[in-house]
């Protein structure tokens, strides 16, 4: 017999939804180069340059300005109260500062989590109840217009996260820029199955990966 749904106030869940690892992977012909950006190497920023390959990744602040991402950048709101119906949109900007064209994709993966117990006494993990979506644009204005309101964001973010979510591939010529809207939400229909009880607070740590491959054709 399934437990009956009931209204239970949601406890505050401070999720570690931060950019804990930004990986830029450049495949240049015969070799591959990897650059990890984590809080253990604060001197490394998000600018990766090798043999004409130069990519920068930024995120948009609340005042509309853009900030380059490094290993200590909190891209997601780590004080967000995730409950059914909550939606968050993060805007990224990928720039080709080099001299060679490349194609890239963006992925979100779960780097770590803490399992908790819900109000029904059942174990659960947050990634089981979060959904993601990605929208892209060639200009900042186009990006803003692509998600004019919350309802549009909800319609876009319909892919389950589970442990990994990946976008399609996008091409970027030298001097080009691509804007990305990354949407995370907890559907309203989730209910109390993701509402924890007890002393163990559910937690999830996400990483964002940007993989870029040189276009040789």
Language-model-derived ranges and their functions:
Residues 47-68, 113-163:
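A surface/secretory-pathway sequence property marking extracellular, secreted
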Residues 27-29, 36-40, 82-148:
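Surface-exposed interaction patch
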Residues 8, 20, 45, 58, ...:
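Short acidic, gly/pro-rich beta-turn/loop elements at beta-sheet edges
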């Amino acid at each position: 017999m399934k437990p009956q749904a009931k209204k239970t106030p949601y406890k505050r869940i401070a999720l570690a939804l931060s950019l804990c690892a930004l990986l830029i992977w450049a495949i240049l012909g015969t070799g591959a180069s990897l650059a990890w950006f984590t809080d253990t190497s604060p001197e490394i920023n998000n600018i990766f340059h090798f043999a004409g390959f130069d990519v920068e990744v930024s995120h948009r602040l609340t005042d509309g300005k853009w900030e380059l991402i490094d290993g200590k950048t909190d891209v997601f709101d780590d004080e967000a109260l995730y409950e059914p119906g909550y939606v968050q949109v993060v805007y990224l900007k990928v720039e080709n500062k080099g001299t060679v064209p490349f194609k890239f994709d963006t992925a979100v993966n779960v780097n770590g989590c803490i399992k908790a117990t819900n109000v029904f006494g059942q174990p659960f993990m947050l990634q089981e109840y979060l959904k993601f979506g990605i929208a892209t644009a060639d200009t900042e204005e186009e990006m803003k217009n692509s998600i004019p309101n919350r309802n549009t964001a909800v319609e876009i973010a319909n892919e389950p996260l589970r442990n990994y979510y990946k976008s399609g591939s996008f091409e970027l010529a030298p001097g080009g820029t691509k804007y990305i809207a990354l949407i995370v939400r907890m559907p309203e229909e989730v209910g109390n199955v993701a509402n924890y009880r007890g002393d163990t607070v559910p937690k999830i740590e996400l990483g964002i990966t940007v993989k870029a491959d040189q276009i040789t054709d």
